[in-house]
Amino acid sequence: LAEQAERYEEMVEYMEKNLLSVAYKIISSIEQKEESRQAFDEAIAELDTLGEESYKDSTLIMQLLR
């Protein structure tokens, strides 16, 4: 019975570590998405400052990124 309790505690500890790892990955993913959205929005705001050829190239790249 003591061995089972010890294995149970080890299993709980392992599951807690996995849960923390998953939570970290989710939070990192959300932060990366927000940073990407902000960079994209900033790039859109800068389009008006570009010449015609650069504007065409930039809009094509941004369409591909979207």
From Swiss-Prot:
InterPro entries tied to this protein: 14-3-3, 14-3-3_dom_sf, 14-3-3_domain
Superkingdom of the organism of origin: Eukaryota
Listed Pfam families: 14-3-3
Similarity section: Belongs to the 14-3-3 family.
Protein name: 14-3-3-like protein 2
Source organism per UniProt: Pseudotsuga menziesii
Taxonomic lineage: Eukaryota, Viridiplantae, Streptophyta, Embryophyta, Tracheophyta
